[in-house]
């Protein structure tokens, strides 16, 4: 059995790490490099950085802090934000990123996934999906440009269909960002993640809702995800990553120590 992964997420805006609730009202929580170094020292398996306004503002993630992060940590990290071309992806990888993640640009141009996969290999390409549960229709829908409230829009894609589409086009991993749960620390959306798990032949990372150590245990056992991503519980020091891993190991979950 492959060991499960713990992945802190750092949302970046204007050069700082920020955190919102349900993708709104972002507040500054710290500086990029010190937080990255702290999480690496605590035992994070990898890090994910989202430049949350890059796509909405038609720019690409700032490479200067990518290189500074690469100099300071010795664990893999993934970068996302406005990546629309092979050249932009190549630059970020050259500056030290191990993976690149694409979200809104892939919705605008799904062929981007295949082109990136052809150039860099499936293992390097992560697709982020911002999924919103619409109670009126009892369905999961994909949203785009979620880093900017004014630019956010609903797409024509249902989450399950988009999960299948991105796999056909060659993604190596999927991060399912459950918007309804984001930042509220009420637990991961086990129902939705379990549904996506059945459709997902590539590694699946759960995102949105972590509030206690038990929430991590539950998502690994019940939804059978490969990794759990979280932000506010780590930023606010509610959960220490090393202690979380000890807890999960004691619960019988294969986890990297």
Swiss-Prot record:
Coiled coil: none annotated. GO terms for molecular function: imidazoleglycerol-phosphate synthase activity; lyase activity. The keyword Amino-acid biosynthesis applies. The active site is at residues 11, 130. Gene3D superfamilies: Aldolase class I. One of its GO terms (biological process) is L-histidine biosynthetic process. It is found in: Cytoplasm. The keyword Cytoplasm applies. InterPro entries: Aldolase_TIM (IPR013785), His_biosynth (IPR006062), HisF (IPR004651), IGPS_HisA/HisF (IPR050064), RibuloseP-bd_barrel (IPR011060). Pathway: Amino-acid biosynthesis; L-histidine biosynthesis; L-histidine from 5-phospho-alpha-D-ribose 1-diphosphate: step 5/9. Its EC number is 4.3.2.10. Belongs to the HisA/HisF family. This is Imidazole glycerol phosphate synthase subunit HisF.
